[in-house]
């Protein structure tokens, strides 16, 4: 079932944390949850061009603190901070409490699963071939340090009549391993043929229970790896001519000497 379950929900309280961090009683829980959903939908629409990877919402003591992880923080802040002030006013109107907004920069957007999925969906909406978009994203992620990546696209790919699913994988993506740091993201491409769904899994290495990465295991040196098969001319005589009980053929028998003339 590791292939089907949501990778983030599977690892909650083990190596991953919640994106909504607050406590509420039974009466207020539904209202606050609906507010979080509205805030996330608003930020997704408002900051569509800012490459937002994830949003964390915290509610300490009748306040709200929202952390936005973006690959383009300058777009969120705007000139002289005007855009972020307007954003803060809109969020306060949505939530009804004072809101503090923090902007965090994503250092490697090529290895962020949500940003990869959004990038592929934008390319599909511009009529770029889905295979080219998927393979280009995989190459960029592996080049910048990802240990494995898997991308899946579903829908009327290239405008075909019958919807299908195609996926590509490079490297390792251990979905059953709880300590594996799996980043997961989804997106939708609204094309003229219909909606195409994109799912992205990025494996960034193993993670300890406290959220820290373990020391990297030493990779085997080149001379310690399994040697390749030797060329035919460099093999020992036994391997070339065959031995009793082996798979090779036995030594070739010498041709009979020609009979002397006159007999």
From Swiss-Prot:
Organism domain of life: Bacteria
Any one GO MF annotation of this record: mRNA binding
GO CC terms in record: cytosolic small ribosomal subunit
Domain annotation KH type-2: ranges: 39-107
Disordered as annotated region, ranges: 211-263
GO terms (BP aspect): translation
Keywords associated with the record: Ribonucleoprotein, Ribosomal protein, RNA-binding, rRNA-binding
Basic and acidic residues: bias regions: 219-240
Pfam family, one: Ribosomal_S3_C
Family: Belongs to the universal ribosomal protein uS3 family.
PANTHER family per record: 30S/40S RIBOSOMAL PROTEIN S3, SMALL RIBOSOMAL SUBUNIT PROTEIN US3C
Subunit structure: Part of the 30S ribosomal subunit. Forms a tight complex with proteins S10 and S14.
Function in brief: Binds the lower part of the 30S subunit head. Binds mRNA in the 70S ribosome, positioning it for translation.
Designated name of the protein: Small ribosomal subunit protein uS3
